[in-house]
Amino acid sequence: MTPSELRRLYSIVRVLLSYGLDELIPKMRLTFPLRAGRRLLFWLPNRHRNMPLGERLRLALQELGPVWIKFGQMMSTRRDLFPPAIADQLAMLQDKVEPFDGKLAREQIELSMGGIPLEEWFDDFDIKPLASASIAQVHTACLKSTGKEIVIKVIRPDILPVIKADMRLMKRLAGWLPRLLPDGRRLRPREVVLEYEKTLLDELNLLREAANAIQLRRNFENSPMLYVPEIYSDYCSEGMLVMERIYGIPVSDVDALKANGTDMKLLAERGVQVFFTQVFRDSFFHADMHPGNIFISYEHPEDPQYIGIDCGIVGSLNKEDKRYLAENFIAFFNRDYRKVAELHVDSGWVPADTNVADFEFAIRTVCEPIFEKPLAEISFGHVLLNLFNTARRFNMEVQPQLVLLQKTLLYIEGVGRQLYPQLDLWKTAKPFLETWMKRQVGLPAVFRALKEKAPFWAEKLPEVPELFYDGLRQHKMLKHSVDQLAYELKTQQARQGQSRYLLGIGATLLISGTLLLISRVEADMVPAGLMAAGIVTWIIGWRRTR
């Protein structure tokens, strides 16, 4: 470790111990050095003894900074690793920090513009930030060319070295974990950290966020359900994002929404429809839809429209994942646990040699109590959570796209029930899922697939005669090769049969001569002749096997 890494490690240890998080170290022989080391650091007492463990963990991560805050947010979705009290606290982590100097933001913007003075492109730049987070902050301005109001998102100037240093430490810690914990290898800590690093570095590239927002805007163009602000891509770079400024009511401000006359039932149901449309129609979903990234338009409160911002994290599902997921939901709510178990095996999410009967029983044991509640009170997100946690006991591979989906579904469900507590999410989603499933089977689906593949076949059709001729020629050559191989195999088998016969005769003659010699028969030449003939015959047989 470098001196700077050692200093940072000491800083992390100091914060963790000040919140008494050493109690998370399991009491076992392998972890004795860690527990002994804790006693040596006697000058770092637990200063928050009266707080619950989950709250202490949340506060410690917030004190450690952006890398650890976002890691805690991600780990809040892994409820197979933490008890509910800790996972709930991790989900409350707030990604809010003090804004950095507006003059520095101005310098960063001009640097992203290639050194061009900010006034050449923008008017009315507000040096005071509109919003600030751990990765970036936002300033308002107007486009000089059109006068349109915009917001400029700019990456913090000092954030990259901090992130890289903390990620190096996190990887080292992940490498130690399997050696210290008996279950450490199954948890795959290194893979979890590498996945997190990729997500974090993606967020640092605002060109990626711009591309995601453009895609999402195109998917919901002219939609009454969701509006995505326009991105001005000519002004965007890795460190700067420029987009249309929007005005709306934060989705968490229920009182303001009601005061505006918003149809709360329709708004809650539309949130569910937006989510399932993104997942099943578009295979491209906004995976960071927490309340801070969702607003509601002031216009047409009787026909409310969502406004989505911050597309830094997105997810996607392939066709097979979508089909299996939809079938899982439908089978689960029909209480067909056998089907749920078979779908997990068929999809490859759990190993092919999984005992389906045992898996079905485990799913039934965990999920059947859920149906003691009315359907309107059943949580889709917790259904997924229970399914995945049960499947992990049967060696289910971690599916990053499903973890993102589960997290997003929990956000959407929480927001929906905050807006309209009587929201029946299953009743809203079931028609959508059943309609989507019907579109995937039958003649319409076949014709649609043919239409999608038409350009491919139009390109390949002229090559069909040549491919057909090549196939016939290769078939003829293959037949000749097979015949030749069969002949050689038959010859080899015949030679091996003769060899075994000669080896048997040689061994018989050799044994007979030896027995005669031992019995001291008077005709001494007979056993010697038999032994000599046996040796010669055995050698001939052995050579024919080569």
UniProtKB/Swiss-Prot annotation:
Compartments reported by the entry: Cell inner membrane
Pfam families referenced in this protein's UniProt entry, alphabetically: ABC1
Pathway(s) served: Cofactor biosynthesis; ubiquinone biosynthesis [regulation]
EC number(s) from the headed UniProt entry: 2.7.-.-
Binding-site residues for ATP, renumbered to this chain: L130, A131, S132, A133, S134, I135, A136, Q137, V138, K153
Residue intervals passing through the bilayer: 499-519, 521-541
Gene Ontology cellular component annotations, sorted alphabetically: plasma membrane
Name of this chain's protein: Probable protein kinase UbiB
Origin species: Pectobacterium carotovorum subsp. carotovorum (strain PC1)
Taxonomic lineage of the native organism: Bacteria, Pseudomonadati, Pseudomonadota, Gammaproteobacteria, Enterobacterales
